[in-house]
């Protein structure tokens, strides 16, 4: 188990889902190939021989660039639901009374901080025109990814009552600048 004790599980029913590779425009092919080369280099993904395969989906980012990701809809249909609680935004409002200094912490590739359980790695396979790849770290788009990430953040931020975690956003709320510096120091230690 990793130091934080959280691994992503994908409990499924039925047979492995399988898809064919989708054709890509030359631009999307280049972006996708570069992204998967980077994911492999970083140890986030690896080449696969899995019986599972979800199609590659390339979506536009807000800045107009392309984001390659797995289209896990068919896998998600046969994945059992994780009932770990996800907070609702209005659950935080009472705790924010009297707070006037805020910082929002954005985790870069936060979902990739969570390893996929070794038994479930083959289920994350994505078929591309340049090969089959599976994820060693949790990719975006999986059913229960939000629950796994919330579980991680609840574990990491346990005891920090000034930290409010909602999905991959962390809000630090304080009553003064001096207190805020202490809160940020405690969070990052």
Question: Predicted regions span which residues?
Answer:
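Retroelement reverse transcriptase polymerase core
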Residues: 1-189
């Amino acid at each position: 188990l990793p130091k934080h004790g959280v691994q992503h599980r994908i409990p499924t029913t039925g047979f492995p889902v399988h898809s064919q590779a989708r054709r890509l425009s030359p631009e999307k092919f280049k972006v996708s190939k570069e992204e998967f080369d980077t994911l492999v280099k970083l140890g986030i993904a690896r080449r696969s021989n899995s019986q599972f395969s979800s199609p590659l989906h390339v979506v536009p980012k807000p800045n107009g660039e392309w984001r390659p990701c797995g289209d896990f809809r068919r896998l998600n249909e046969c994945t059992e639901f994780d009932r770990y609680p996800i907070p609702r935004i209005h659950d935080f409002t009472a705790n924010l009374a009297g707070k006037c200094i805020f910082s929002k912490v954005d985790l870069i590739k936060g979902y990739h901080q969570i390893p996929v359980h070794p038994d479930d790695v083959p289920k994350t396979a994505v078929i591309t025109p340049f090969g089959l790849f599976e994820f060693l770290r949790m990719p975006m788009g999986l059913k229960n990814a939000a629950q796994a990430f919330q579980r991680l953040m609840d574990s990491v931020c346990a005891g920090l009552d000034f930290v409010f975690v909602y999905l991959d956003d962390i809000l630090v709320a304080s009553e003064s600048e001096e207190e805020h510096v202490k809160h940020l120091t405690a969070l990052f230690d």
